[in-house]
Amino acid sequence: MEKDDLTHFNDEKRAKMVDVTSKSETKRRAIARATIHMNEETLARIHAGKIAKGDVLAVAQVAGIMAAKKTSELIPMCHPIMTTKADISFEDDGNTALTITSEVVTVGKTGVEMEALTAVTIAALTIYDMCKAMDKGMRIEKTYLVEKTGGKSGTFKAEA
């Protein structure tokens, strides 16, 4: 099998979950990021705690952490893993953009890239849901894997 061959298909060319039985357990870590753009007033109201549905960042943080833990229930070929760390942080540009960063860690046989990506995606969707009454034009953009470490493929860092 060549390095780029798809591993999620069986001999009948049907979907399967990859067998990781013989892989070694190693520490694996992934960082992902997403940005949600909104009106200036929306971001100001989030920071002032003046969104009718509640504390937007606290709810989005919990939603992102929950999403990391439930990724295998959402993405069919993801292995259920024991998440040993899931964290969500927020940074704004002081104007109209809020950047969400997740860090997910495990010790296991498969990586946590999908968990980190799912975490930032769900956190961004939660922000959209909580603020859509005042800003339906919000845009979720640039969701990507920033870095991953551990496992056979080693370290990956996105280009700046």
UniProtKB/Swiss-Prot annotation:
EC number: 4.6.1.17
Superkingdom of the organism of origin: Bacteria
UniProt pathway: Cofactor biosynthesis; molybdopterin biosynthesis
Pfam families (UniProt xref): MoaC
Residues reported in the UniProt entry to bind substrate: M77, C78, H79, M114, E115
Keyword Lyase part of the UniProt annotation: yes
Keywords: Lyase, Molybdenum cofactor biosynthesis
KW Lyase (keyword) present: yes
Family stated for the protein in its record: Belongs to the MoaC family.
Subunit structure: Homohexamer; trimer of dimers.
Enzyme class: lyase
InterPro entries on file: MoaC, MoaC_bact/euk, MoaC_sf, MoCo_biosynth_MoaA/MoaC, Mopterin_CF_biosynth-C_dom
Source taxonomy: Bacteria, Bacillati, Bacillota, Bacilli, Bacillales
SUPFAM superfamilies: Molybdenum cofactor biosynthesis protein C, MoaC (SSF55040)
GO molecular function: cyclic pyranopterin monophosphate synthase activity
Gene Ontology biological process: Mo-molybdopterin cofactor biosynthetic process
Gene: moaC
Organism, as annotated: Listeria welshimeri serovar 6b (strain ATCC 35897 / DSM 20650 / CCUG 15529 / CIP 8149 / NCTC 11857 / SLCC 5334 / V8)
Active site: D129
Protein name, entry field: Cyclic pyranopterin monophosphate synthase
Role description: Catalyzes the conversion of (8S)-3',8-cyclo-7,8-dihydroguanosine 5'-triphosphate to cyclic pyranopterin monophosphate (cPMP).
Catalytic reactions on record: (8S)-3',8-cyclo-7,8-dihydroguanosine 5'-triphosphate = cyclic pyranopterin phosphate + diphosphate
